[in-house]
Amino acid sequence: GSTCLEPKVVGPCKA
């Protein structure tokens, strides 16, 4: 997904 809860996703994330 695109949330800050996903460590594999680094960059613009939805807090």
Curated annotation (Swiss-Prot):
One of its GO terms (cellular component) is nematocyst. GO terms for molecular function: ion channel regulator activity; serine-type endopeptidase inhibitor activity; toxin activity. Keywords: Disulfide bond, Ion channel impairing toxin, Nematocyst, Protease inhibitor, Secreted, Serine protease inhibitor, Toxin. Its main location: secreted. The keyword Cell inner membrane does not apply. The record marks K14, A15 as: Reactive bond for trypsin. It comes from the Eukaryota. The keyword Disulfide bond applies. It is found in: Secreted; Nematocyst. A synonymy between H.magnifica and R.crispa is controversial. This recombinant serine protease inhibitor inhibits both trypsin (Ki=2.5 nM) and chymotrypsin (Ki=30 nM). It may also inhibit the TRPV1 receptor, a receptor of the pain pathway. In vivo, shows anti-histamine activity, since it dose-dependently weakens the clinical manifestation of the allergic reaction induced by histamine injection. In vivo, does not show toxicity to mice by intraperitoneal injection. Belongs to the venom Kunitz-type family. Sea anemone type 2 potassium channel toxin subfamily. This is PI-stichotoxin-Hcr2l.
